[in-house]
């Protein structure tokens, strides 16, 4: 018996060694293929083991990439470790060559999302992506978005009441966390029809789960030892991720079941149809393909989870960095405030039509997105070869990183790129600009389907903030840019808030 077990152990050890060797061989062949594909693109020197990972994980890494754009025009290889290599692009014609096509997302990055958000619009490709995109597009029509203005305002006012108390202490405080709570509450109301009216999420298992999943997913992407699924699910970090995933899925599944049951009841269905607005789940349950088939429960959950994931973090980043820019440039802050006051006049609240009138605020917001794009990088895998404007090319299977932050600060595209100048986005200055020079919501057929929703929310939130408070920076706690799934700050965004009095906000 002992001899049999000993032989079995030897066989198992041998099998593990063989599998490990085959895995290593596969990785080496992949590296060789990627390196050969990018042979015509010079780039910064790499570490023998970590590639460029040590450089891009340092504080100030975003601005390091910007300096590389001056050394290596158009694009350069970017190695994350020895086996994952992207062509990092930051020039409009290069961006157009890839992102005008609709290639799938790079699995080396986006496969980490699957356990939580499933195969929703973010990670789907091919005919099913096209089908879902077509089905979901009516959900972002302006007739659907109009009633959301009141929801945006309600959640914002709750946050502003909290800020009123904090501002009275006379200290600067980090706004990022509060904006995140408000954005998630807003999204829950727009998705499920209800949120947390007090923005106090300690008892909300769904809020805790979504917040934790976002953090854990970023930590996994940043940690090489967690990239292997088998190893990751055995770690405490992986088990924590699975628990949070289960909590989020249980909540979404429960709401879907309840809503489906309500739609079977004639009276309940009539109540839903007579509400002030349809939420995102209502719309998903109502859509049908050309054959009349509805989305499956699996597809429903994937699209809801995708909407929650994409919707709250990006707007949190956009709003927080915009308020920082307003604090940094008080003359633009005041001009935006005056514009909003003039638009509101004697009204008690914003109307849908008011949003289009916020022209200067919109220009300031776009300039903020140029300098601080909510999503600093997006990734693709080429489904077919691509040829670039300078004659260089890449084969199918190559990985692409579009570095939006570097593109938006490329001095060949933007004169004086570090200067905050909202007039870059005036109609006369925008006319004739390359369509891929400014792409805060990505670009092409796979651009952000919810960009109008996000812009509307950010306009309402920031306008109400500017009416209630005057913002100024804390010179001792300036934000340190941290590129993750969205653009964050390593030390938060600390601002001083000065209440403008009860008559400032209508």
Curated annotation (Swiss-Prot):
Swiss-Prot/TrEMBL keywords: Endoplasmic reticulum, Heme, Iron, Membrane, Metal-binding, Microsome, Monooxygenase, Oxidoreductase, Phosphoprotein
Modified residues (Phosphoserine): 431
Function in brief: Cytochromes P450 are a group of heme-thiolate monooxygenases. In liver microsomes, this enzyme is involved in an NADPH-dependent electron transport pathway. It oxidizes a variety of structurally unrelated compounds, including steroids, fatty acids, and xenobiotics.
PANTHER family: CYTOCHROME P450 4B1, CYTOCHROME P450 FAMILY 4
Cofactor(s) it depends on: heme
UniProt lineage: Eukaryota, Metazoa, Chordata, Craniata, Vertebrata
Organism in which the protein naturally occurs: Oryctolagus cuniculus
Topological category with respect to the lipid bilayer: Peripheral membrane protein
Alphabetized Pfam families for the sequence: p450
GO cellular component: endoplasmic reticulum membrane
Name of the molecule in the record: Cytochrome P450 4B1
Catalytic activity: an organic molecule + reduced [NADPH--hemoprotein reductase] + O2 = an alcohol + oxidized [NADPH--hemoprotein reductase] + H2O + H(+)
Enzyme class: oxidoreductase
Family according to the record: Belongs to the cytochrome P450 family.
UniProt keyword Calcium, yes or no: no
Cross-referenced Gene3D superfamilies: Cytochrome P450 (1.10.630.10)
């Amino acid at each position: 018996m002992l001899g049999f077990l000993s032989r079995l152990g030897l066989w198992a050890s041998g099998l593990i060694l063989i599998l490990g060797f085959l895995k290593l061989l596969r990785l080496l062949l992949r590296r060789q293929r990627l390196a050969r594909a990018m042979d015509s693109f010079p780039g910064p020197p790499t570490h023998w083991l970590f590639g460029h990972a040590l450089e891009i994980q340092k504080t100030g890494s975003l601005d390091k990439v910007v300096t590389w754009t001056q050394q290596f025009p158009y694009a350069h290889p970017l190695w994350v470790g020895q086996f994952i290599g992207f062509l990092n692009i930051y020039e409009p014609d290069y961006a157009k060559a890839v992102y005008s096509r609709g290639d799938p997302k790079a699995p080396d990055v986006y496969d980490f999302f699957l356990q939580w958000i499933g195969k929703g619009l973010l990670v789907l490709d091919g005919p099913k992506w096209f089908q879902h995109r077509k089905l979901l597009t009516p959900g972002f029509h302006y007739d659907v978005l109009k009633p959301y203005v009141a929801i945006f305002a309600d959640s914002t006012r709750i946050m502003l009441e909290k800020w009123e108390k904090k501002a009275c202490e006379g200290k600067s405080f980090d706004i990022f966390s509060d904006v995140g709570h408000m954005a998630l509450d807003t999204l829950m109301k727009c998705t499920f029809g209800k949120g947390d009216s007090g923005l106090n999420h300690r008892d909300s298992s769904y809020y805790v789960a979504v917040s934790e999943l976002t953090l854990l997913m970023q930590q996994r992407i940043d940690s090489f030892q967690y990239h292997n699924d088998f190893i990751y699910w055995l770690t405490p970090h992986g088990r924590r991720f699975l628990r949070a995933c289960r909590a989020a899925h249980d909540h979404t599944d429960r709401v879907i079941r309840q809503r489906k049951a309500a739609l079977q009841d004639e009276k309940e269905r009539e109540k839903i149809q007579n509400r002030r607005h349809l939420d995102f789940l209502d719309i998903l349950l109502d859509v049908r393909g050309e054959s009349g088939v509805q989305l499956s429960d699996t597809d429903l959950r994937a699209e809801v989870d995708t909407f929650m994931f994409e919707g709250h973090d990006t707007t949190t980043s956009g709003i927080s960095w915009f308020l920082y820019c307003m604090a940094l440039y008080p003359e633009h802050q005041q001009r935006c405030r005056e514009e909003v006051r003039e638009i509101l006049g004697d009204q008690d609240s914003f109307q849908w039509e008011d949003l289009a009138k916020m022209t200067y605020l919109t220009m300031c917001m776009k300039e903020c997105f140029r300098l601080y794009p909510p999503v600093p990088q997006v990734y693709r895998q080429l489904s077919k070869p691509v040829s670039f404007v300078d004659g260089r090319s890449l084969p199918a299977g190559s990985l692409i990183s579009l570095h939006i932050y570097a593109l938006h600060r490329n001095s060949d595209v933007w004169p004086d790129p570090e200067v905050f100048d909202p007039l870059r986005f005036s109609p006369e200055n925008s006319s004739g600009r390359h369509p891929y020079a400014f792409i805060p919501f990505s670009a092409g057929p796979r651009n952000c389907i919810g960009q109008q929703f996000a812009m509307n929310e950010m306009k309402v939130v920031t306008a109400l903030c500017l009416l209630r408070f005057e913002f100024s920076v804390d010179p001792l706690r300036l934000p340190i840019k941290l590129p993750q799934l969205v653009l964050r700050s390593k030390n938060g965004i600390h601002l001083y808030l000065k209440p403008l009095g009860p008559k400032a906000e209508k």
